[in-house]
Structure formats: structure tokens, C-alpha cells
């Protein structure tokens, strides 16, 4: 099942320039795969870096968090709630992400306890790992 941008906007509170998920390709109960098309028109490229544009690693992690957020906030019991970062562990950046790349982002929920969830996430470009990490979230109202 795919999820288009309209359903993503319904699930997430983020808007331009902070909405970093373009489409969901696959979704199951605890796993989601989505894409972010990276273009030279992204506002962060104006300063990171003008002569050598590279997507900031923290924004790759934010895109992964939003990917997980789409899955969690699409559930009826979480409709209208917010998801907040509670932590990031084992974050690694392996490949620069540049204009023209398509980030393929996967997030798998590995632990849930009350309003806290732990996700294993990774972002790839052309089948090569760009970034990965363990993300912890708190689901709030």
C-alpha cells in the first residue's frame, strides 16, 4: 500500500520547508518505507554548502523520524497527536546526500512501551547506506 503526499500531510503536522517525506512506498503494522526526492531547491542548500551542496545529516535523521511518524500518526488511536524525539543512538552517516538523490527511508518499530517507541531506521541512496540509527520517540497529544 502506498501513501501519497495528501495523506502524509494529514498524518504529519510538518509543512514546507520542514516536511521531508514525499511518498510512502510500503507500510505494514510496524515497518514503513518512504522516499524523499532531494532537489537543489531545498532551502538548506543555500548555506550548506553554497559551492558543494550536501544535505545536513541532522535533516536526514529528521526525514527518518518523519517517516516513522507517518506510520505512528496514521493509526486511528494516534490521530491528531504529535511525535517528539526522545533520543538518537548509534547514528552513523556513510554517504553524502546531494541534489538529485532520492532517499529511500525505512523505519521499523522494534519496541513499544506506553507512549515511548524505539525505531531502527536507515536511509539509502541507490541501494547504498547513507545514514542509520536507533530513534526513540514519545507520543504526545
UniProtKB/Swiss-Prot annotation:
It is an enzyme of class 4 (lyase). Disulfide bonds: none annotated. The active site is at 48. It catalyses: a (3R)-hydroxyacyl-[ACP] = a (2E)-enoyl-[ACP] + H2O. GO terms for biological process: fatty acid biosynthetic process; lipid A biosynthetic process. GO terms for molecular function: (3R)-hydroxyacyl-[acyl-carrier-protein] dehydratase activity. It is found in: Cytoplasm. Its EC number is 4.2.1.59. Pfam families: FabA. One of its GO terms (cellular component) is membrane. Keywords: Cytoplasm, Lipid A biosynthesis, Lipid biosynthesis, Lipid metabolism, Lyase. PANTHER family: 3-HYDROXYACYL-[ACYL-CARRIER-PROTEIN] DEHYDRATASE (PTHR30272:SF1). Involved in unsaturated fatty acids biosynthesis. Catalyzes the dehydration of short chain beta-hydroxyacyl-ACPs and long chain saturated and unsaturated beta-hydroxyacyl-ACPs. HAMAP family: FabZ (MF_00406). Belongs to the thioester dehydratase family. FabZ subfamily. This is 3-hydroxyacyl-[acyl-carrier-protein] dehydratase FabZ. It comes from Streptococcus thermophilus (strain ATCC BAA-250 / LMG 18311). The lineage of its organism: Bacteria, Bacillati, Bacillota, Bacilli, Lactobacillales. The gene is fabZ.
